[in-house]
Amino acid sequence: MKIVVSDCDHASMRIEEKVLADAGFGYEHHACRTEDDLIAKCAGANVIMTQYGPFSDRVLAALCPDLGLIVRYGVGVDTIDLDAATRLGVQICNVPDYGMNEVSDHALGLMLALVRKIPMITNSTRAGEWDYRMSIPVRRIKDMTIGVLGVGRIGRLFALKAMAFGGRVVLCDPYKPDGKSRVPGAEQLPFDDFIAAADVVSVHCPLSEETNGLIGAPEIARMRPGAFIINTARGGIVDEDALAEGLASGKLAGAGIDTVEVEPLRKDSPLRALDTCLVTPHMAWYSEESANELKRKVAEEAVRFAQGHCVTYPVNRPA
C-alpha cells in the first residue's frame, strides 16, 4: 500500500507519521502544486492525502487504476473533480467536523469588530485621538437581524452563538431553500427575503456551481443600507469586485473575509485599501487544537481505507 502526501504546508508531519506508523504504514511527502507535479510525484499511489493539489480529470485518469482514495486536509473539495473521481472509482473524503468552533468564533469575531468599529477606533487612538465620536454611528447588535447563509455544522453553530445577543437570527440554506429551520428560535427564509432582511450576512455554505457568485452586485443592491458581509467559507461565493464597490459606495458598512477567490489576495485588490474591509489569511479554521485534530483525522481516514475498512467521511460514491 503506497500512501503519499501530495502537498501540505503544515510545519510538522509528526501526527500523521505516528498514526500511519502505528498502523504499519510509511508514506512519501511531496510539495505538488501543479497537475504535472501530481502526475509525476504521485504515480503508483493508492492513497493520497492532499491540501491544495488540483486533482482534475486529467490528473485522476493518469493516477488510476492504482489510486483508490484521496483525503483532503479540510472541508472543501472544490480542488477535486468529483465527477471524474466518481467515474474512475476514486473515493474522496474530507474532514467536515474539525475546527467548527474556530470558524464560527472567527466569523463572530469579524462581525463584532466591524459592528463595534474596533479596528477603526483603535487606529484613531493610536494616532493620538481620544474621542468615541470618531466611531459614530454604531448600532446595537440586539436590534440587528443576523443572517446565516448555509446551515451546515458551522452555520448552525454560528447561529446558536449569534442568538446569545438576543436579536433576530434568520437562516437560508441554498441546498434546502424550502426546508424548516434547523436552529430552534431562528427563522428560515427564502434567499431573496433573506438578503433583504439581514443586517449581517455570514456565509457558511460550500463553493459549488450553485453557490459560485451567489452574492454579487444584484444581491448587494437588495441588501439593507449599512449591512455587513462576513465570509469564512469560500471566496468565490462572494463577488469580490461587487463587494469592493458596495463598500466604496457606502452601501455596505463593512465586510470581514477570511477567504478570497484566488489566494493570496492579489496586491492590487481594492479590498486591501478599504478601511471597512477586514481581511484575514484563511486562518478561521486554525487553533493548535483544530490543526492537530485535522492532521489526525486525515491520517486515520487513510489508515481505515488502507486496512480495508469503511471510511468515516465519504464525499462521493465511486462507481
Feature roles, as predicted:
Residues L67, K142-T145, A217, G226:
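Phosphate-coordination loops involved in phosphoryl transfer and adenosine-cofactor binding
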Residues L88, I92, G226-A319:
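Rossmann-like dinucleotide-binding domain for NAD(H)/NADP(H)
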Residues L88, P96-T145, L157-L160:
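Phosphate-binding beta-alpha-beta segment of Rossmann-like dinucleotide-binding domains, i.e.
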Residues M1-C93, A196, G216-P218:
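An N-terminal-biased, well-structured beta-alpha scaffold segment characteristic
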Residues V151-G152:
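Glycine-rich Rossmann-fold phosphate-binding loop(s) that bind the pyrophosphate
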Residues G53-L60, P174-P270:
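Rossmann-like adenosine-cofactor binding region
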Residues N46-V47, L69, V200, F228, ...:
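Short, Asp-centered acidic motifs that coordinate Mg2+ and/or phosphate
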